Amino acid sequence: MEWIKQLGKLLLVLVLQVLLFNRIQIAGWCFPMVYILFLINLPANLPRWTEMLIGAFVGIIVDVWYSSIGVHMAACVALSFLRPILLHNLVQDVERVTNSVSRLTIGRIEYMKCAITLTFIHHLLVFALEAWSLQNWWLVLLQTLISSMMTLLVILGYDSLKR
């Protein structure tokens, strides 16, 4: 039954990304990628291979909508690979977290650190792979920072609504 709930969350996040957040582009610098909320909030007790497979699946779906060849998939797989490492470093008893990761299950500060780190890494990979050059690295970094801030506003705002 839990997997049906997770599938529903995934569909909701992807529909919102494609229909709403895909249309929000501020001056060509801000591209909120809120779909990573699903990957960040996956249960902490998932096997790593399952988490990475889910990340690849989510990334492929987003790549189809954005017409990007593997960019989002690579960034989502990297996020899915790094998330358990980050959780084990931030949360002392991460094995006890069987539900979705949120501020309620791991703590507010730990969740914010996790969300900020994973969002920045994901966005940096997306924009660096899209640029495919280090010639204008500062533009990639600026776009990463601005888009990460917008994405984090939505992610942390959503999480603050949970009770």
Features from the language model and the residues they span:
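Terminal, non-globular segments
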Residues: 1-163
